């Protein structure tokens, strides 16, 4: 989405609407062919556009697809990879985009920070408001844009950190964040609040996304046009995904053997039944008070919950291993596309077009979902998935050829520009430092 770097600034291009000034000094307007050529040519990183498009297509599948649970012997179930991993791919892409709009490989100077932060703030608010509108339409899905807007704002303090420091900050959040959130949920006996649901306990959790945003920002400071860098990104991502998946499966089997009363399938079933029973009875129970607090805490099965916060591979569980697995998949996808997207740029043009306007494509998908399924309704039909994908690919390619930047991407770019212009320009400082190495 635009939050994943939708407009031309986010990918480092000069946009696709207007050609450079002609030799005579008059600006020459681009035709369809020139717009499409600019879409897949440097300085735009078309691999990132393709990655965004794949994330959108995966999100559409998660919303409307009829996908069976994963079974190694059932090829159709491999499509279940879209659940959870599509949104995590967006998280890494959002971090890359934040790095690109704040200097690419060059760390921004202190004098640049006020305008850069104001611009990110304006973009984040615009994305948040668009997400609110979509939520109020009753789409029946967990709209990602409100959380995306928060992510852009949360990145303001760290835009001057070097890649090594971004990674050092991401690691403890990924390792400890899920456990701390689960612990706080248990200590509060699962209390609910809209703010906590937005950033900590909902489908999109800050403790899951923050490490991936920081990872993406570190990637965005790297020379992504170098094949060696792309190959290392793909290799590291593949290794992380395989190791996290293997570790999750092995630990689940080991704990189920060593402590079946806590981690075995019967214990999981009993925990689910207890949740249902508690939900059915809580309306008639008065406040428990401190006398019943310990008993209520024990009934939540802390050992099970804390273990799941580390080893669960369930989509949107927010566990430590889910972060490493989904982050690894995202790196593998991005690294692989950095290697092949440029040579295959014309073949991948429709995906590049969709990925250049992901906020628009995502929003159109949600509006179409409301039209087809009614407010609050849902669909599980792979034909709808295919039709939605093809329709968006054609529409986005046509719009890119005729108009360039997507309509909602124009809105967020305008908001970012106006917010940045509202901050007085700082006095010129010393010469900029060299690019990050």
Regions found by a protein language model. Name each.
Residues 2-10, 15-437:
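Alpha-helical transmembrane segments and their immediate juxtamembrane cytosolic regions
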């Amino acid at each position: 989405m635009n939050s994943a770097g939708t407009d031309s600034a986010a990918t480092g291009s000069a946009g696709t609407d207007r050609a450079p000034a002609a030799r005579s000094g008059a600006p020459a307007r681009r035709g369809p062919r020139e717009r499409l050529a600019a879409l897949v040519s440097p300085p735009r990183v078309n691999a990132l556009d393709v990655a965004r498009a794949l994330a959108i297509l995966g999100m559409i599948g998660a919303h409307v697809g009829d996908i069976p649970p994963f079974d190694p012997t059932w090829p159709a179930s491999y499509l279940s990879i879209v659940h959870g991993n599509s949104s995590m791919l967006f998280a890494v892409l959002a971090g890359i985009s934040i790095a690109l709009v704040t200097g690419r490989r060059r760390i921004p100077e202190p004098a640049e920070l006020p305008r850069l932060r104001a611009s990110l703030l304006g973009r984040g608010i615009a994305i948040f408001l668009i997400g609110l509108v979509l939520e109020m339409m009753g789409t029946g899905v967990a709209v990602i844009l409100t959380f995306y807007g928060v992510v852009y704002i949360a990145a303001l303090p760290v835009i001057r950190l070097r890649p090594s420091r971004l990674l050092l900050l991401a690691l403890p959040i990924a390792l400890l964040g899920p456990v701390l959130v689960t612990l706080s949920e248990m200590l509060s006996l699962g209390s609910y609040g809209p703010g906590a649901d937005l950033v900590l306990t909902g489908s999109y959790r800050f403790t899951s996304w923050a490490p991936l945003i920081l990872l993406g920002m570190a990637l965005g400071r790297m020379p992504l046009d170098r094949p060696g860098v792309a190959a290392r990104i793909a290799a590291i991502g593949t290794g992380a995904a395989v190791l996290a998946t293997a570790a999750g499966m092995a630990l689940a089997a080991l704990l189920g053997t060593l402590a079946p009363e806590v981690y075995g399938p019967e214990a999981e079933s009993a925990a689910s039944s207890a949740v249902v029973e508690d939900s059915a009875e809580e309306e008639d129970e008065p406040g428990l008070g401190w006398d019943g607090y310990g008993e209520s805490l024990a009934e939540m099965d802390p050992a099970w919950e804390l273990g799941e916060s580390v080893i669960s591979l369930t989509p949107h569980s927010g566990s430590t291993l889910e972060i490493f697995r989904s982050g690894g998949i995202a790196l593998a996808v991005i690294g692989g596309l950095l290697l092949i997207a440029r040579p295959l740029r014309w073949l991948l043009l429709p995906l590049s077009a969709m990925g250049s306007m992901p906020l628009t494509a995502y929003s159109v998908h949600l509006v179409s979902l409301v039209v087809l399924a009614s407010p609050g309704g849902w669909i599980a039909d792979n034909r709808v998935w295919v039709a939605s994908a093809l329709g968006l690919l054609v529409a986005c390619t046509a719009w890119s050829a005729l108009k360039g930047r997507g309509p909602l991407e124009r809105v967020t770019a305008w908001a970012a520009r106006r917010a940045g212009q509202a901050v007085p320009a700082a006095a010129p400082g010393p010469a900029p430092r060299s690019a990050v190495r």
